[in-house]
Every structure is written in structure tokens, then in C-alpha cells.
């Protein structure tokens, strides 16, 4: 396998050929904001937050880090003024449509959207607040789906299809009416592995058995073997 040498923010980076910029940055402790990328899932490019400046073959342009492969000698800049303005606009748009229920959300404290909002020091944005008011779906004893918190990152859809091989959920409708759900809004029929909860960055998917049992920082992590993955 060929090794590609390039630069991110003046830091020399090496990565296997075919690696995308986002993963190469992760592997080398370089932070690029992102909410839809997951190393175990196919690239989706839905959140638009991993926007970076790329110079390769003497041409400079802008790319999404999760969808652009590394190339020999490329120069990547993560935080130029234009890049920062673009990311801020994307975040302002997401927050204008997102249910701000952080005090009662079990994801609070480990929420990707919350963390990036804090990092960017965002105040109320320029966009008019237009939030959805979907009913919370609790059609089974294990999982619940709050579409008002969903940013349509696609992680849960990919995890259900690619890891579990079930495909119980998918995108519904188009445009501003797009939501995550089951076919014909039928009750969820799956193995209830919790993969959707594990990969969700915003708390749209929740484990009903853990609701209000503690804050994210109060739980201890324990190495274990997942019966669905072993």
C-alpha cells in the first residue's frame, strides 16, 4: 500500500493511499469539526462542517474533508477566515432548526452539536428560527426517536444497513420535509442493538431504559463484547 505525504496546517502528515482527509487528520490528532463522519461507516458528507481549503496540483479550492482523498504533496488548511465563516453559517442554520432541549436531553455533555457550538462561541444566529414539532416516537420499549433533534447526518441509517445489515430505517420525504423513519411509519422492527443510539451525535435516538438515570459524565465506561458484533 502506497503512503501519501502531505501537510495539514503546516504539520507533515502521512496516510495510506485512498484515505480521506478527515480520517487522516483523526489518525494524526488534527481536529476538523464534523458530525456525519464515522470511521466504521461509508462517507455521507451530509453535515458540511468538515469544509477545508485544499491546494493540490498548484490549484487551491475548497473540499469536504470526509469525501476528499489525500494526495501527494497536498496542502490542507483547516481554519482560514473563509472556512471559519462557512462553518459558522452551517452551524447557525443547524441550530435554527434544532430543538434546544439540552437540559432534558440525555446526550447533553457528549453531544457533538453542543460541543461544536461551544467551540465556535456561537450566539443566536442570523437565520430565522424554524423548528419542527414532530411527536417523539416511542413505539417499542427500548428505543425512542425525537426527530426534532435530528440533523439528518445519516449515521443511524448507515449503521443499521452496513453494520447490522437490517436497514430498518431510512430517509423519508424530500427537502425540508426529510426525516428519519421506518417504511410507511410502521413500528420499528429490528434487533434493537442500539447501534443507532451509539452513532447518533445529537440525541435524536435515545435508549429508553437509560432515560434520566444520570448525566453523560457520571457514567463509567466498561470494556465489553457486544453480542451483536462478536
Spans of model-derived segments:
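N-terminal cofactor/phosphate-binding cores enriched in small/glycine residues
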Residues: 4-72, 81-86
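Fe-S ferredoxin-like electron-transfer domains
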Residues: 48, 52, 56-227
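Short, surface-exposed beta-strand/loop patches at domain edges
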Residues: 230
Amino acid at each position: 500500500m502506497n503512503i501519501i505525504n502531505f501537510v495539514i496546517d503546516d504539520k507533515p502528515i502521512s496516510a495510506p493511499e485512498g484515505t480521506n482527509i478527515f480520517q487522516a487528520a483523526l489518525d494524526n490528532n488534527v481536529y476538523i469539526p464534523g458530525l456525519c463522519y464515522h470511521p466504521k461507516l461509508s462517507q455521507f458528507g451530509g453535515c458540511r462542517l468538515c469544509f477545508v481549503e485544499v491546494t493540490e496540483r498548484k490549484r487551491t479550492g475548497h473540499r469536504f474533508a470526509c469525501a476528499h482523498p489525500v494526495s501527494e504533496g497536498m496542502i490542507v488548511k483547516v481554519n482560514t477566515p473563509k472556512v471559519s465563516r462557512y462553518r459558522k453559517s452551517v452551524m447557525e442554520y443547524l441550530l435554527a432548526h434544532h430543538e434546544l432541549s439540552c437540559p432534558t436531553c440525555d446526550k447533553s455533555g457528549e453531544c457533538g452539536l453542543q460541543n461544536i457550538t461551544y467551540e465556535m462561541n456561537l450566539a443566536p444566529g442570523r437565520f430565522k428560527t424554524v423548528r419542527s414539532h414532530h411527536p417523539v416516537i416511542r413505539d417499542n420499549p427500548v428505543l425512542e426517536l425525537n426527530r426534532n433533534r435530528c440533523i439528518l447526518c445519516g449515521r443511524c441509517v448507515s449503521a443499521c444497513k452496513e453494520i447490522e445489515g437490517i436497514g430498518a430505517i431510512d430517509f423519508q420525504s424530500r427537502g425540508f420535509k426529510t426525516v428519519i423513519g421506518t417504511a410507511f411509519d410502521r413500528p420499528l422492527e429490528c434487533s434493537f442493538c442500539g447501534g443507532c443510539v451509539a452513532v447518533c451525535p445529537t440525541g435524536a435516538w435515545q435508549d429508553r431504559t437509560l432515560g434520566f438515570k444520570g448525566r453523560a459524565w457520571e457514567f463509567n465506561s466498561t470494556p465489553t463484547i457486544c453480542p451483536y458484533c462478536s
